[in-house]
Amino acid sequence: MAKSKKPVVVGIEILKKNGLDVDSLIKELVINASVEFTAYYYFTLLRANCTGMDGEGIKGVIEDARLEDLSHFESCIERIYQLGGSLPKDATQFIKMSGCEFLQLPPNPTDLTAILEKCLKAEQGAIVNWDKICNMTLGKDPATYDIAKDILAEEIEHESWFLELLYARPSGHMRRR
């Protein structure tokens, strides 16, 4: 079925013509996929350790961010493969490239402030990562730009949730979507 001849992919050729380094973009998308997947995993652990009366209210916020991180991971995968890339075959290597070791449970695994600080740090890192993709693709790759722009907006929203909880800083939302 599969032919050994490498196909011409017009969608990729146009991006190159637009001045985009497609290989660099794939590399950044794989890193972002790793970050989103690892954040999803660690947010699962952090959420589970939000205990007691105060923890119950925080679980929902972490759960919303966690599920959106899974969606971000899925968006990355689709675009990586469309661009001719792939994920690493070794899951350990994939997780290590995320740099998310800081998201492990705090020494006191039910310390809600420490959990929220970890969540905030994760969201702020994601903002930097997705801003980088937006800057790489602006005016060169509208498909990836739209994905990155939408994810960036969600990461900024998540940051505001955790800032609100940690610093009593109004976030502007009436309820999470």
Regions found by a protein language model. Give the residues of each.
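Iron-associated oxidoreductase/ferritin-like identity signal
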Residues: 1-177
